[in-house]
Structure formats: structure tokens, C-alpha cells
Regions:
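Chalcogenol-based redox active-site neighborhoods
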Residues: 1-162
Length: 162
């Protein structure tokens, strides 16, 4: 279970989206900065808070050129209901194979019941990891304000050095 470090190419993951065509990240980010979030499930209040925070920051993320995609092990029905209830406009993938995702990304897995622990990645426009945040439990995760600030910082410094 290798951890992904800054500069590593993010592995291709397919996210099954309720009622829509599956997407593949990092390609879905379409040469923009990307955020990939792994969440424990709809039952987790910390996961709900994180996903709602990224939804509330949607306009700011868009203005900063950042796209968001998330996934968890919950089934399609639960994911569709959660997405509708919280008005998520970014893709939330369902029925993730926790062990397969962990093998590709190094995410921590809870065995019983089986789910991914909170994990987050910020990717550059070429699909390389800028930051990886691994949690072994309920807390410790990316927040949208930090992601926006980081991307703005990177853009400002790239422009200054060009």
C-alpha cells in the first residue's frame, strides 16, 4: 500500500456516478487543478460536513479553476439520496472497492465494516499529486479554503518565476 507523494502521478480511478455516466479521474479534471476526496460514508457526520463545505465553496473553487470529485463505498441509492439531500453539484462516486482503491493510493481501510478512511488529494493540471492527506480515522481532512489558498499561491509563484 504505497502512499502517494508530491509529484507522483495520480492513478486512474473510475467513479460510478448515480444516474450518470461513470467518470475517470484525473482525466475528468480536464487540465484544471483537481481535488479527489475519499469519504467513509453517508453515516459519517465529518464526511457530510466536508462534502457540504466543498459544495458551499463551489463558486470560489470554480473561480480558482479547481474541480472536485469524491467517492465512497456506499451503494448507488444511498449516494443518490445523499447527493440530492445536500445539493451536491460535483460527482460523488458510489460502490467503490475499498481494497482496490487503497492498493492504488495508500488510503487507510476500515475492515469491519469495510470502508475507506478519509483521504484527500490536490492534483495539478497534469494529474500529479501536489498534496496528499491521509487519515486513519474520522478526522483529519482537506478543507476548501486551504485548497483554494494553495492553488492561488502556486499560480502566483508560477507567474512570478515565469
Amino acid at each position: 500500500m504505497p502512499l502517494l507523494h508530491p509529484g507522483d502521478t495520480f492513478p486512474q480511478l473510475t467513479l460510478s456516478i448515480p444516474g450518470a455516466q461513470a467518470i475517470q479521474v484525473p482525466g475528468w479534471f480536464d487540465r484544471e487543478f483537481g481535488v479527489v476526496l475519499f469519504n467513509r460514508g453517508a453515516w459519517c457526520p465529518y464526511c457530510t460536513a466536508q462534502l457540504r463545505a466543498f459544495q458551499r465553496a463551489g463558486d470560489s473553487l470554480t473561480q480558482a479553476g479547481i474541480r472536485v470529485a469524491a467517492l465512497w463505498v456506499d451503494d448507488e441509492k444511498t449516494t443518490a439520496e445523499f447527493t440530492a439531500r445536500h445539493g451536491l453539484t460535483f460527482p460523488l462516486g458510489h460502490s467503490a472497492d475499498a481494497r482496490a482503491v487503497a492498493a492504488l493510493t495508500g488510503a487507510f481501510v476500515n475492515e469491519d465494516p469495510l470502508y475507506l478512511q478519509s483521504t484527500g488529494f490536490v492534483l495539478d493540471p497534469r494529474g500529479r499529486v501536489i498534496v496528499s492527506v491521509y487519515s486513519s480515522g474520522a478526522i483529519g481532512r482537506l478543507v476548501p479554503e486551504d485548497v483554494i489558498g494553495l492553488v492561488r499561491y502556486l499560480r502566483e509563484h508560477a507567474a512570478a518565476s515565469a
